[in-house]
Amino acid sequence: MVFNSGRYMRPHGWHAHRWHRGDRLPPDYRMQTYVIPDYATYGLRPPPPGYYWVRVDNNAVLAAVATGVVLDVAVNLFH
């Protein structure tokens, strides 16, 4: 299922990137603006302690709060 979650803008200076497990999200993507608090609405599993879901382009990325290290990616979840 693909969701329309409204307007989205990348942080200034960042371009599309295909994220993978082990990558590190830059701090700009770890701001509250990109956090997905209602992850269950989008069919995402609860994040483990110390992680959160963030929207990056059309994807939902599960990343560590402290470091931004990517644990998982839900590809093309948004349009």
Model-derived segments and spans:
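Low-complexity segments
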Residues: M1-H79
